[in-house]
Amino acid sequence: MKNGKVLTATIADIHIGKKSTEALRKELEEGFLTYIEQEKENLDLVVIAGDYFDRVIRFNEPAGILALDLLDRLVVAAEDGGFLLRILQGTKSHENNQLDVFNGVEESKPHLLKIIRKVTKETLNLGGQSRQILYLPEEYPSDPDSYYADYFSDHYDLVYGHGMTDIVGFSFSDWKDEGENISLGTPVHATKTLLELSEGPIIFGHIHNKKEYRGKFYYTGSYSRYAFDSQEPKGWLETELDVDDFSTYTVTFHENKLAPTYGVIMVDNLPLEEGTDLLDVLQTMMDSYDYAKIISADDNNLKLIRQLAEGSNEIKVQTAKKLETERVDSKFNFILENKLSTEETIQKYLDLTEPEADHLSLEVIGMLINPTKGYDYDDVLDQLNRDKVVVD
């Protein structure tokens, strides 16, 4: 406890093995682990809300050693300070059952550490009082409503989870960044339901940009930064709760100030004076970033930029033409989503690509794509006339 309040810390989406292990180790040691060491005697509960790992790793490679070292540091701090440690399973394709490597630690320290692999209720003594906690690790039940029914009929003091919710589940921009994918069968939790379940805050991992909803639901965001479209500050959450009333709390975001910076430079928009050396300007600008994406539509500029980027993993070159193509292509996502009938898909495609042409009805399109049903040319013409479509 701190100042008579229950103190918790939540970190998520560490993604060990995704990028530079050396850099991530430094970010953890000078950020989150320093905080844990300073607050260990005040903390009551520390939660890792999923995606501890990013990929399958070998535990004799640097990423594997970091994974072991991080847990060891947290367990030692928990023993010294007396706080509890909980680790939630994250996305299957990231964790790859590798949390099992910590089973021995969990078995030897059951009073400190629990790894949560399936939906779980737990009663904890926090601040001298029994508190009900609900954990929602990422799972893939065939019937989510039935699977969670018993758990969602109860009431809790705190909820921790990893996965999709309806405040982000239907917004492509919220989960497309940094290579995150929606796994088949992933349930999308209703935020309204979660808000009604809990007296205190609901804190989730999975979405890499931190979010707050109605002052009660939170995504921590990823601990570090991994992509150009994730510019928000990175870090972890601290929660202080009134010992007698968990509906009274303060959530504080702690920034990982060493998270790498990703900058996008639009070359064609730069106010360059005649005679200015473009490469000198770009080099100066790139000194402000750890990673830079340089975009231009000018072929001569692109040749120069590619010379600058040659052999570098920190510089990405992209043509403005490609960006325009991506914007156009996104209009046709409905084809891949496969939610419309064949006739409706064709109709929508024609309306988008030939906006000046006459609108074809579903009946006409059906006749054209189903000749085996006995429609002939006159049938199609008759339908076109009924639709008042002019035929040359």
Regions found by a protein language model. Give the residues of each.
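Conserved beta-sheet core of the metallophosphoesterase superfamily
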Residues: 173-245, 249
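N-terminal active-site segment of His-dependent metallophosphoesterases
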Residues: 1-69, 147, 151-155, 370, ...
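A short helix->loop->beta-strand "cap" motif at the edges of active sites that frequently abuts
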Residues: 76-85, 197-200
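Accessory, non-catalytic peripheral segments of nucleic-acid enzymes
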Residues: 2, 241-392
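Active-site environment of divalent metal-dependent phosphoester hydrolases
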Residues: 15-19, 54-57, 86-102, 122, ...
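Divalent metal-coordination and catalytic microenvironments
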Residues: 13, 46, 51, 67, ...
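Conserved catalytic scaffold of divalent metal-dependent phosphoesterases
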Residues: 86-188
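Beta-strand-turn-beta hairpins that frame and shape the catalytic cleft
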Residues: 1-9, 121-135, 153-158, 214-217, ...
